[in-house]
């Protein structure tokens, strides 16, 4: 029996600030393994990492094979809308080809930068958030789409971002908003689920990410976000169960 694969597109270098918890791939695999067990998926899964920030991409023809269950795009410190860095421009073209083609490809989950670069690839406007940096553990208000997807009115997710997506790609639905970010995630049935937040970050990681970006906030904002890291339940694992449901084409 062929072991099914998840293709992880790693869009960053290893960061010193997150080192105690590993890099974004380490945290992604830990999250996917935790949620795989919660979803009672007994089959073994292989995680195949592609260092796209080093211009290492999967072949589109390979992704059409049945061995791939899904594609996971990590977060990154880079700008998804950059027009000078080769691999970012190549990634947008790669995603546009995959997501607009009539050919069937595995479902795609995008995290933070992954959320933004998917939107940019589909023609949405992405840039610096005029409302500023959003970080720590943030409460998201779910709309009717999000409530149906996640079975809740609100979700608390880790966030570390200064960029945002300004409009929803055609054929997709936004599922949540926050005080500073109107489009917190996109959904297309059986195809795409994105998170502006980081479901793979526990609250300690979120707090460390907040600390490294303290200079982007007023003291009042920083203190409020820091309190939220300590007081709000982090629903990252609960939310990420839907990544597996997407990969299995149950949502």
Swiss-Prot record:
Its EC number is 2.4.2.-. Its main location: cytoplasm. Induction: Induced upon copper deprivation. It comes from the Eukaryota. One of its GO terms (molecular function) is transferase activity. Transmembrane segments: none annotated. Residues 48-232 form the Glutamine amidotransferase type-1 domain. GO terms for cellular component: cytoplasm; cytosol; nuclear periphery; nucleus. The keyword Transferase applies. GO terms for biological process: intracellular monoatomic cation homeostasis. It is an enzyme of class 2 (transferase). Keywords: Cytoplasm, Glutamine amidotransferase, Transferase. The active site is at residues 112, 198, 200. Gene3D superfamilies: 3.40.50.880. The keyword Chloroplast does not apply. It is found in: Cytoplasm. CDD domains: GATase1_1 (cd01741). May have a role in copper and iron homeostasis. PANTHER family: GLUTAMINE AMIDOTRANSFERASE YLR126C-RELATED. Present with 1510 molecules/cell in log phase SD medium. This is Putative glutamine amidotransferase YLR126C.
